[in-house]
């Protein structure tokens, strides 16, 4: 019991280390994540069991890498494609409570866990869909994801799903968490910008981690 509590405190410290102006509600919501995921992961495996004790580093803080590149505005519409257990969508929804997040996954049991975590946290700015992204009819300011496919494939899935109106410093498009050498993968995307996460986070885990921003033209 003591170990679990201590681990949670240490884990929360890594969030506070890089995001020091959280509200009491945000602190409470972030602090609940490990317990919620640990409980649901015993029933439905959505996070690697070896990662569950490092949830805040490998999943929560990694998801929040997008927030170091983009501060979503109130009322913005963001879709998380292939959200899995809710990453990066849920941590971003906690950090940006006035931004609307749509979490999509084709695997029903994963969306079930996401729905339960969202309910457990009392988050009101998240909606979910069990289905394929190609079936989604809405458009968004940004589409986020965590390496669910090669960029060529991912771009094809979401190319018609961005708003025309621009409201942010970065142009509407994809914000993609990726890792490793992306030279070949991004060869056909000269407008892509790579943000290296070691510039924001000092932990070894982020050594090769990146956020890729790919602006996309509106196609009505």
Task: Give the positions of each predicted feature.
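Conserved beta-strand signature within the Rossmann-like core of class I S-adenosyl-L-methionine
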Residues: 167-181
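Active-site capping/gating segments
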Residues: 181-220
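Short glycine-rich anion-binding loops that position phosphate/pyrophosphate groups of nucleotides
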Residues: 147-150, 182
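Conserved SAM/SAH cofactor-binding pocket of Class I
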Residues: 64-145, 155
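A short glycine-rich, Lys/Arg-flanked "PGG" loop and its adjoining helix->strand segment in the class I
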Residues: 155-171
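N-terminal auxiliary segments of SAM/dcSAM-dependent transferases
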Residues: 1-45
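Conserved SAM-binding loop and adjacent beta-strand
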Residues: 29, 47-67
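Conserved hydrophobic residues forming the short capping helix/wall of the S-adenosyl-L-methionine
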Residues: 41, 117-118, 162
